[in-house]
């Protein structure tokens, strides 16, 4: 019997809290080996720098390798999440499928940020600001 592959595109619901959690994890240890400094652009939009992105702000990330400066925005972070989820060699699956009261799929997907450790947050940020994994 012959098998066939079909490529499907999923839509993933990402909450403001998910964005805050990913950026917090990245800033508190995920990206510290290649990012020497993170700086809020403009006014703080939340209490912490990690809340800047989910509220539509920008963070400047200063690369420890030379004079490179990367700007992280919400759109870039969402693209980084997309690229991470498409990476077939990703260390963890961070998506979950929504189910109804009888256990059937609702066709909706979300992020399980309990699966986003420093490695995953780093990969998402690298995909977001560099388009690929540069440092590992």
Feature roles, as predicted:
Residues 36, 45, 101-107, 116:
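Short interaction-hotspot residues at assembly and binding interfaces
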Residues 58, 64-66, 70-88:
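Short alpha-helical interface patches
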Residues 109-135:
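Acidic, proline/glycine-rich low-complexity IDRs
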Residues 10-22, 68, 72-79, 111-120:
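Alpha-helix boundary/N-cap detector
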Residues 22-26, 44, 76, 80-84, ...:
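Charge-rich, solvent-exposed alpha-helical interaction surfaces
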Residues 1-69:
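Long, contiguous N-terminal structural blocks used for assembly/anchoring
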């Amino acid at each position: 019997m012959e098998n066939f592959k079909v490529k499907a595109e999923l839509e993933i619901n990402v909450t403001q809290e998910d964005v805050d959690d990913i950026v917090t994890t990245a800033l508190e240890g995920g990206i510290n080996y290649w990012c020497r400094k993170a700086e809020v652009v403009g006014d703080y939009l939340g209490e912490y720098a990690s809340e800047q992105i989910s509220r539509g702000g920008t963070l400047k990330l200063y690369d420890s390798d030379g004079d490179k400066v990367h700007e992280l925005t919400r759109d870039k972070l969402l693209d980084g999440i997309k690229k991470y989820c498409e990476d077939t060699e990703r260390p963890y699956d961070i998506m979950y499928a929504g189910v109804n009261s009888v256990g059937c799929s609702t066709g909706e997907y979300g992020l399980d940020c309990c699966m986003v450790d420093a490695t995953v947050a780093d990969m998402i940020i690298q995909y977001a600001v560099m388009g690929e994994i540069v440092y590992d």
